């Protein structure tokens, strides 16, 4: 059985279907299905998986903000999902600078390197996950 989320998105975006699929309810529909069946979808599932629009911070995040379509051909809001950014041991200097900015700290090269090194030395993987709402996205872009 083909997955509903992928098929409906393909019909809408790639085949320009004249049908009015309500893609914005796909994530809610997936969660409802999970509640009834007690079958959790894989985190890596496209469209509705918990990692579908999750991005590690750093240069990857900078690229997402410059040109989201390069990494996300289907916008997260269109399918009821949202973009999330993750800070942790892979953040790097750029990611650390973004984190400092979001926390209201003055970001400089030395501070960003120190934060990146501290995150890496903790060796705890992903430490902070933040839903990237419009307000935060604008702040990151303005603070470049």
List each model region and its residues:
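A mid-to-C-terminal "edge-of-domain" accessory segment
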Residues: 18-144
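C-terminal helical cap(s) of enzyme catalytic domains, especially alpha/beta-barrels
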Residues: 1-23
């Amino acid at each position: 059985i083909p997955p509903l989320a992928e098929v409906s998105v393909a019909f809408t975006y790639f085949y320009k279907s004249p049908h009015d699929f309500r893609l914005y309810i796909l994530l809610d529909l997936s969660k409802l299905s999970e509640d009834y069946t007690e079958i959790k979808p894989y985190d890596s599932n496209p469209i509705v998986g918990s990692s579908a629009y999750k991005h590690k911070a750093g240069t990857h995040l900078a690229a997402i903000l410059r040109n989201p379509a390069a990494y996300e051909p289907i916008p997260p809001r269109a399918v009821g999902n949202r973009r999330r950014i993750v800070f942790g041991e892979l953040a790097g200097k750029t990611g650390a600078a973004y984190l400092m900015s979001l926390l209201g700290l003055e970001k400089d090269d030395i501070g960003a390197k120190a934060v990146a090194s501290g995150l890496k030395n903790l060796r705890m993987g992903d430490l902070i996950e933040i839903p990237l709402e419009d307000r935060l996205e604008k702040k990151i872009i303005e603070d470049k």
